[in-house]
Regions:
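A conserved mid-protein helix/loop that constitutes part of the nucleotide-sugar donor-binding site
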Residues: 18-22, 212-235, 251
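Short, structured helix-loop element that forms part of the nucleotide-activated donor/catalytic region
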Residues: 48-51, 199, 226, 241-264
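Membrane-proximal helix-turn-helix segments that form the acceptor-binding/catalytic region
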Residues: 132-158
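Carbohydrate-associated surface elements
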Residues: 161, 183
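Aromatic "clamp/platform" in nucleotide-sugar-dependent glycosyltransferases that forms part
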Residues: 271, 290
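Short glycine/serine-rich donor-binding loops of glycosyltransferases
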Residues: 295-298, 316
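Short hydrophobic beta-strand element within catalytic cores of glycosyltransferases
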Residues: 307-310, 320
């Protein structure tokens, strides 16, 4: 099939971006003719030339007006529509809020729901500023059109919670939404030298073998709940250490850790390229996010054999089985609840968690994920042929 994939920034660095790159490479490997429409692209391999017949991927640069963020969003949506209409594709799948596509994958969630949830962590006046902020108004306008009948042939949600949000806010029929969970490369996190890697990382960071090591991975600390994680950790009875990985301004959180008297026990590492070894060094993954469509980091933690403690509002909570491989947080701002869930998760038998996660994640392979995507593609192409 000749397939167009739309992503404003295409790269194999970063969670959502790596996912799109993975889809493109997997589909190209199966012999499909893949065309990437992006405003910019950057990656670690030579295939990121404008056209690569060897990789089966062709890149098309979409003009984007730089400057104000709302202008960038709108110009990408308008220009990608213009360029896509100049070509004939069997399937057009967008990973962005755009104006011309057959399939939209709502990997970034529902913006209307995010604005609702962020009221929990924003000052009271921000709610009113959002109503006049042109960026939010543009995103909401595109999102509304995107979910209007006639502007899509199928929608893919990465969790059942995400599906319910779209139905609730926009009235999209349930039959028009397919839930396909994110994939994970289990082998990437299944190091046969697990204990050796664990000891190396702990020694480098000054973490004792007997310390309970908690890991937080995610960029955008405010939304993903780092403040709650730090405050909850300060209440733990066990001897613990917290590793924080991700891109954001850490100074606010460093000051809070100092205020609580726990600064020496919180390690801010920034973004890293070798995150696998930190999963292996940890005893538990903590992710008390305020809103998250589906956290790839939770899947990665499970693949590394960690119990996961995360918010129910995280789509990835649907793969957490309480009391077996982790626990869920009902209120991501309730640090007492988070502390209790962490202590409960640390009591789980680690070998049992490792074995359970390994078996549970078998259907989450890239091979199975792409098979599910292709089933949707075939359904959509069938509809297109029926409608002429």
């Amino acid at each position: 099939m000749k397939i167009a994939l739309i992503r404003q920034r295409y790269t194999d660095f970063g969670g959502a971006e790596r996912y799109v790159a993975g889809v493109a490479k997997q589909l190209a490997h199966l012999g499909h003719d893949i065309h990437i429409y992006a405003g910019s692209w950057r990656a670690s391999s030579k295939e990121e030339s404008r056209s690569s017949s060897r990789s089966g991927i062709t890149f098309h640069r979409v003009p984007v007006a730089r400057g104000l963020s709302f202008i960038e969003v709108l110009s990408f949506a308008l220009n990608s529509r213009r360029l896509l209409k100049e070509e004939n594709f069997d399937v057009i799948q967008s990973f962005e809020r755009t104006l011309y596509q057959d399939i939209y994958r709502a990997g970034d969630g529902c913006h209307r729901e995010w604005l609702k949830q962020r009221e929990k962590i924003d000052p009271w006046y921000k709610k009113y500023l959002h109503t006049i902020n042109p960026l939010h108004q543009i995103i909401l306008a595109i999102e509304k059109q995107l979910f209007t009948e006639g502007h899509y042939r199928m929608i893919i949600a990465n969790s059942f919670r995400g599906k319910d949000e779209i139905i609730h806010h926009y009235g999209v029929p349930s039959t028009s939404i397919r839930v396909i969970y994110n994939p994970v490369d289990v082998d990437r996190f299944n190091d046969p030298d697990r204990m050796e890697r664990r000891d190396e990382v702990r020694k480098t960071l000054g973490i004792a073998a007997s310390d309970r090591c908690i890991l937080f991975v995610g960029s955008g600390f405010k939304r993903k709940g780092l403040l709650s994680a730090i405050m909850a950790a300060s209440k733990l009875r066990q001897t613990w250490q917290l590793i924080v990985i991700g891109r954001d301004h850490a100074s606010v959180y460093e000051k809070e850790a100092s205020r609580l008297g726990i600064r020496p026990f919180v390690h801010f590492l920034g973004p890293v390229t070798d995150v696998e070894k930190y999963y292996l060094a940890a005893d538990l993954f903590l992710f008390p996010t305020v809103y998250e469509p589906f956290s790839n980091a939770c899947l990665e933690a499970m693949a590394a054999g960690l119990p996961v403690v995360t918010s129910r509002i995280n789509g990835a909570s649907e793969v957490v089985v309480e009391g077996t491989n982790g626990y869920m947080i009902e209120d991501p701002l309730n640090t007492d609840e988070i502390k209790d869930r962490v202590e409960m998760a640390l009591q789980l038998n680690r070998n049992s968690v490792i074995h359970y996660n390994r078996e549970y994640l078998k259907p989450f392979s890239w091979q199975n994920h792409v098979r599910q995507l292709l089933e949707v593609y075939l359904e959509v192409t069938g509809k297109k042929h029926q409608n002429g």
